Curated annotation (Swiss-Prot):
Monomer. Interacts with complement C3b; this interaction is dependent on the presence of Mg(2+). The gene is CFB. It comes from Sus scrofa. This is Complement factor B. Residues 477-758 form the Peptidase S1 domain. Precursor of the catalytic component of the C3 and C5 convertase complexes of the alternative pathway of the complement system, a cascade of proteins that leads to phagocytosis and breakdown of pathogens and signaling that strengthens the adaptive immune system. The alternative complement pathway acts as an amplification loop that enhances other complement pathways (classical, lectin and GZMK) by promoting formation of additional C3 and C5 convertases. CFB is cleaved and activated by CFD to generate Ba and Bb chains; Bb chain constituting the catalytic component of the C3 and C5 convertases. InterPro entries: Sushi/SCR/CCP_sf, Sushi_SCR_CCP_dom.
Length: 765
């Protein structure tokens, strides 16, 4: 590998993140044995072994698909003998052997059945889940046992939607206590003996209908995350943190290719790099760790943001090389230069390991920000990255400093505003010596995010950084807005497009649309006629005076407004969707940016969904079988000027769906229609009405605009405004209860979107 890459660091395990001491699965000896432990009779049947820590630790290694039984690690005791081979039940075993990896069975499954039922499952075995009547399946209906000992896919959950929060489910291998999902109700998870719980043991139903913490799983000591899984999950969470600064802290993003954020004096995000330089690391691994941190800085810089960096190296005592108060701390190139200058010999004379003292320096830097910028400190996000072997031998438990940091940043105190988004602690355990319980205790726990990882070896760690740096897909800025108080309407709705069609002797018509890529605007097909010429169609974006000319309008091939005139249905809006191709490529800026389309990598990332998430699973996340909060943007006139206003509606996707659709028969021109399915096909989403809330209705000029779901500070288009039962803008009185609006469901026209947008680098799933 080149010198600018994170090299192979040998077999000493490294931790990227925060790791408390005592990382071996079996405690490491406090003193060297009087004589070396003998290697006679320690072989493992079906595998091999190698020595770590200068012969003080032995690791058993098995072929792919097998794991060492009864233990993976043995330590050389002070008596000169190896630690005993015994199971989790303390049963003594005479000889180690490699056993076939199996996946755990479901401990329980609520409101449904799974098949086949077995005591255990071998690699490639499949299991299927089905729900009882009245319950809807979320997650994966079919799952396969993988070579890692984990099931692929996502937790299968049968839910009737009756709770304030959705059923959190029972991940395979866990047991759940608690079946009430009301506000502030809690559920608790447990693992079988010998397995370690990763994630949140206790989760609480919060305001807004989400669960605190992160979904738990039960891990065996032989289980590892793959580099692809780690890179994807880490990038997804890191991107959310970085782009959240963009969206929420009021800094205007630049164009798509040169995204930069000019921070105010307090900074919008601080990243603290803490590097272990104790004698247990070694010079070669210290140098390799530096290069990994350089890769990390490069990845952050690729997002175009400029966080402030703090840099600390430590052994017995810490050395603060860069403070976030330094004016140059936001210069990534300068930070990299300072990182290059540090040497392993800096701590040669005092080479103990005092992780707690190093983290106290991080605490002190945070305190500086709180004390010096009282008006801005609560808008600064903090990310801590520590590289160490995790073996602290002085100073006490570093976890206590994490509690102090949370208190300082006012995190977790206020139930209505817990501020968890303002601190991210990523824990990367590498190698066989990792104590999974310890690293889990330190990692951040956030819904649908993963902050704790365990990698097999440093080669895998290198692969993680390689995939982070070399992934070719766009991480995307779709669905991002600038919500600052000084932002214009188009900062807050940067995808918004106004479409004007001029027809000689027939006047002027207006529609709306949404920017979905650098060349395309998505809108409704009925805005156009076959006689419209492209020079008569103009698109306005970003609130600018400039008008964009178009190259062509692409209609869905199944759209035919007159398809049912023979059945006395004068207008039929099925497949009412069109794409406008602009004649020139857009240059994104703070007022012109794309909205997220469903079933793309960008929308998956926006929702913080796992690598394996399918289009169907994403749809279940965005459009569950219940009323779904959404919004559309309407143009109003106020004080003689046009303003854009968001209007909140509910998509009737559950028990109210049928009643919503039936009201379509109240529309003018549909008096003779007897069967609602003649005009409302499965491709429509329905909003409006007065139950459970009085929804605002669209006006005629809103046609073609996006129906949007706002989630995780991102905006994802799920529909195109098509038609309404009543044009309420022409009425002076209150809208009737049957005033409904219908929108083309984008999930139902995805094949067409994928075909027409295949060259737009959107990464359709």
């Amino acid at each position: 590998m080149g010198s600018n890459r994170c090299p192979r660091l040998g077999l000493v395990p490294l931790i990227l993140g925060l790791l408390s001491g005592g990382v071996s699965m079996t405690p490491l000896p406090e003193a060297r044995p009087q004589s070396p432990c003998s290697l006679e009779g320690i072989e493992i049947k079906g595998g091999t072994f190698h020595l770590l820590k200068e012969g003080l630790v032995l690791e058993y290694v098995c072929p792919s698909g097998f794991y060492p039984y009864p233990v993976q690690i043995r330590t050389c005791r002070s008596s000169g003998s190896w630690s005993t081979l015994q199971t989790q039940d303390r049963k003594i075993v005479k000889r180690a052997e490699c056993k076939a990896i199996r996946c755990p069975r479901p401990q329980d499954f609520e409101n449904g059945e799974y098949w086949p039922r077995a005591a255990y499952y071998n690699l490639s075995d499949e299991i299927s889940f089905h729900c009882y009547d009245g319950y809807t399946l979320r997650g994966s209906a079919n799952r396969t046992c993988q070579v890692t000992g984990r099931w692929d896919g996502q937790t299968a959950i049968c839910d009737d939607g009756a709770g304030y929060c959705p059923n959190p489910g029972i991940p395979i291998g866990t047991r759940k206590v608690g079946t009430q999902y009301r506000l502030e109700d809690s559920v608790t998870y447990y693992c079988s003996r010998g397995l370690t719980l990763r994630g949140s043991q206790r989760r609480t139903c919060q305001e807004g209908g989400s669960w605190s913490g992160t979904e738990p799983s039960c891990q065996d000591s032989f289980m590892y995350d793959t580099p692809a899984e780690v890179a994807e999950a880490f990038l997804s969470s890191l991107t959310e943190t970085i782009e959240g600064v963009d969206a929420e802290d009021g800094h205007i993003p630049g164009d798509q290719q040169k995204r930069k954020i000019v921070l105010d004096p307090s900074g919008s995000m601080n990243i603290y790099l803490v590097l272990d330089g104790s004698d247990s690391i070694g010079a070669r691994n210290f140098t390799g760790a530096k290069n990994c941190l350089k890769d990390f800085i490069e990845k952050v810089a690729s997002y175009g943001v400029k966080p402030k960096y703090g840099l600390v190296t430590y052994a017995t005592d810490p050395k603060v090389l860069i403070r976030v108060s330094n004016p140059k701390s936001a210069d990534a190139d300068w930070v990299t230069e300072q990182l290059d200058k540090i040497s392993y010999d800096d701590h040669k004379l005092k080479a103990g390991t005092n992780t707690k003292k190093a983290l106290l320096e991080v605490y002190n830097m945070m305190s500086w920000g709180v004390n010096n910028f009282p008006d801005n400190w609560n808008r600064t996000r903090h990310v801590i990255v520590l590289l160490t072997d995790g073996l602290h031998n002085m100073g006490g438990d570093p976890v206590t400093v994490i509690h102090d940091i949370r208190d300082l940043l006012n995190i977790g105190r206020n139930r209505k505003n817990p501020r968890e988004d303002y601190l991210d602690i990523y824990v990367f355990g590498v190698g066989p010596l990792v104590n999974q319980e310890n690293i889990n205790a330190l990692a951040s726990k956030k819904d649908k995010e993963q902050h704790v990882f365990k990698l097999k070896d440093v080669d895998n760690l290198e692969d993680v950084f390689f995939q982070m740096l070399d992934e070719s897909r766009s991480l995307g800025l779709c669905g991002m807005v600038w919500e600052h108080k000084d932002g214009t309407d188009y900062h807050k709705q940067p995808w918004h497009a106004k479409i004007s069609i001029t027809r000689p002797s027939k006047g002027h018509e207006s529609c709306m649309g949404a920017v979905v890529s650098e060349y395309f605007v998505l809108t409704a097909a009925h805005c156009f006629t076959v006689d419209d010429e492209k020079h008569s169609i103009k698109v306005s974006l970003g609130g600018k005076k400039q008008e964009w000319e178009i190259d062509q309008v692409l209609f869905h091939p199944n759209y035919d407004l007159n398809a049912k005139t023979a059945k006395d249905i004068p207008e039929f809006y099925d497949y009412d969707v069109a794409l406008i191709r602009l004649s020139k490529k857009l240059k994104y800026d703070q007022t012109i940016r794309p909205i997220c389309l469903p079933c793309t990598e960008g929308s998956n990332q926006a929702l913080r969904l796992p690598l394996t998430t399918t289009c169907q699973q994403q749809m279940q996340e965005l459009l569950p079988a219940k009323d779904v909060k959404a919004l559309f943007v309407s143009e109003l006139t106020k004080d003689h000027r046009k303003i854009l206003t968001r209007k909140e509606v509910y998509i009737k996707n559950g028990e109210r769906k049928a009643a919503c659709e039936r009201d379509a028969l109240q529309a003018q021109g549909y008096e003779k229609v007897k069967v609602v399915s003649e005009v409302v096909t499965p491709r429509f989403l329905c909003t409006g009405g007065v139950i459970p809330y009085a929804d605002p209705n669209t006006c005629k000029g809103d046609s073609g605009g996006p129906l949007i779901i706002h989630k995780k500070s991102r905006f994802i288009q799920v529909g195109v405004i098509s038609w309404g039962v009543v044009d309420i803008c022409k009425r002076q009185q209150q809208a009737p209860s049957y005033a409904r609006d219908f929108h083309i469901n984008l999930y139902k026209v995805l094949p067409w979107l994928k075909e027409k947008l295949k060259d737009e680098d959107l990464g359709f799933l």
